[in-house]
């Protein structure tokens, strides 16, 4: 079993990497992937904390986070597919130019 601090540090590093990718990248697909990394980092923190205290609540929260991430990814990919069909571009700047 890894110590609590090591697991939380790993989760924080993953969260910061996802946040950095979300802020820096202009492609919507990479932004969606960065958001998934952030969700998984938060879920990892739940699992590590639950394992440290010997509770199954962390694993239950992980299952909830994974199901929410799957729903978010499916809706996000459907929107990205429609945007790519209409604009032939996944740049975030093209979304801000939408009319109507």
Swiss-Prot record:
It holds the Pfam family Oxidored_q2. Gene3D superfamilies: 1.10.287.3510. InterPro entries: NADH_UbQ_OxRdtase_chain4L/K, NUOK/Mnh_C1-like. It is found in: Cell inner membrane. GO terms for biological process: ATP synthesis coupled electron transport. The chain crosses the membrane at residues 4-24, 28-48, 60-80. Its EC number is 7.1.1.-. GO terms for molecular function: NADH:ubiquinone reductase (non-electrogenic) activity; quinone binding. Keywords: Cell inner membrane, Cell membrane, Membrane, NAD, Quinone, Translocase, Transmembrane, Transmembrane helix, Transport, Ubiquinone. It catalyses: a quinone + NADH + 5 H(+)(in) = a quinol + NAD(+) + 4 H(+)(out). Its main location: membrane. GO terms for cellular component: NADH dehydrogenase complex; plasma membrane. It is a multi-pass membrane protein. Belongs to the complex I subunit 4L family. NDH-1 shuttles electrons from NADH, via FMN and iron-sulfur (Fe-S) centers, to quinones in the respiratory chain. The immediate electron acceptor for the enzyme in this species is believed to be ubiquinone. Couples the redox reaction to proton translocation (for every two electrons transferred, four hydrogen ions are translocated across the cytoplasmic membrane), and thus conserves the redox energy in a proton gradient. NDH-1 is composed of 13 different subunits. Subunits NuoA, H, J, K, L, M, N constitute the membrane sector of the complex. This is NADH-quinone oxidoreductase subunit K. The gene is nuoK.
């Amino acid at each position: 079993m890894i110590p609590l601090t090591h697991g939380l540090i790993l989760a924080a590093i993953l969260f910061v990497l996802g946040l950095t990718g979300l802020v820096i990248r202009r492609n919507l697909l990479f932004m969606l992937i960065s958001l998934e990394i952030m969700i998984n980092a938060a879920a990892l923190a739940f699992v590590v904390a639950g394992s440290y205290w010997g509770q199954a609540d962390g694993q239950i929260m992980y299952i909830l986070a994974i199901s929410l991430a799957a729903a978010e990814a499916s809706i996000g990919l459907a929107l990205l597919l429609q945007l790519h069909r209409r604009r032939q571009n996944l740049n975030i700047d093209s979304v801000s130019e939408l009319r109507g």
